[in-house]
């Protein structure tokens, strides 16, 4: 389980100043979130509004999309979700009550020449499928949050002259959002200076992350062993699962942190064996239902550096050691982590440098006052109104 600096606008060739100004207007407001949304709602016709959300592949795309979908539903919107069959989004979205619209499309990166040569035909077919969905639903807005499914869906939206809103979660833009950003009605980013002519709003997230007490209130008066939360994410992190039990075994039992370790569903049994072999007690779980509360409870979080993890850690205000996934596209997890690390809001350890002995020494040298300082610095970088701002823009565009 997770952004800030000022952003700048970069003019694009062929786009008029008036068009650029048109994009920038709208979501910025001097009114509180509820006031903005209430005003929008009162001025809208009584008809039901429809949004088509497009996001897939990983939890980093899907969970921000779910936060937006739930906020729109609370405002009376009908929300549909464009995704691919057999995917993570198909497992996560329908149980939350959103209609799932499947199309056949997947990525080509690293899948060989044959897959690359078949791309034009596959993309054309996916665009036709997405176009049929858009024609049937006639959505008031289409929202893309990344993953390959966003590209054919975004093309279909623009061909149908539907407003297209994009949100990029990472500090390095994904291919689909990068290509579509020139066609979009609005572009939003979780980190600053990611895409030209985009508005930096942070990541959509559940309210629980923004409502946790400040670090100085949560951590005041704590004594005893440190509380360590290890987060592998929705797919788990094998390197953390292997090294953390060994590191804890290096620490004398009376000095060990109290550990909660989230592994991912596929790795929970292997993790249990690793802790048993190390002779270390810990609370092991494949999934954490309330990540916000878990971040707030921990003195220290050891985790990957996906966009959602980094921005959620900033929202809560938690001290973290980030171990970026080394095979992430364009090494975007390192860039994500640096957003907090460079202001003193956490530590960055590359996976190649992570050893059991080194981690044990790091944990033994940590003091609560240092962790509090890191948590406070992380919280200064939080940007928590993405859901409000994007929903408000949807309501304006749907008038």
UniProtKB/Swiss-Prot annotation:
Task: Provide one Gene Ontology cellular component.
Answer: plasma membrane
Please state the Enzyme Commission number of this protein: 2.4.1.227
Highest taxon of the lineage: Bacteria
Segments carrying the region annotation (Disordered) are 1-30
Query: Which molecular-function annotations from GO does this UniProt entry contain?
Result: UDP-N-acetyl-D-glucosamine:N-acetylmuramoyl-L-alanyl-D-glutamyl-meso-2,6-diaminopimelyl-D-alanyl-D-alanine-diphosphoundecaprenol 4-beta-N-acetylglucosaminlytransferase activity; undecaprenyldiphospho-muramoylpentapeptide beta-N-acetylglucosaminyltransferase activity
Q: In which pathway does it act?
A: Cell wall biogenesis; peptidoglycan biosynthesis
Give the location in the cell: Cell inner membrane
According to its UniProt entry, the function of this protein is described as:
Cell wall formation. Catalyzes the transfer of a GlcNAc subunit on undecaprenyl-pyrophosphoryl-MurNAc-pentapeptide (lipid intermediate I) to form undecaprenyl-pyrophosphoryl-MurNAc-(pentapeptide)GlcNAc (lipid intermediate II).
HAMAP family on file: MurG
Indicate the family of this protein. Answer: Belongs to the glycosyltransferase 28 family. MurG subfamily.
Protein name per its UniProtKB record: UDP-N-acetylglucosamine--N-acetylmuramyl-(pentapeptide) pyrophosphoryl-undecaprenol N-acetylglucosamine transferase
Question: What is the species listed in this Swiss-Prot or TrEMBL entry?
Answer: Acidovorax ebreus (strain TPSY)
* Name of encoding gene: murG
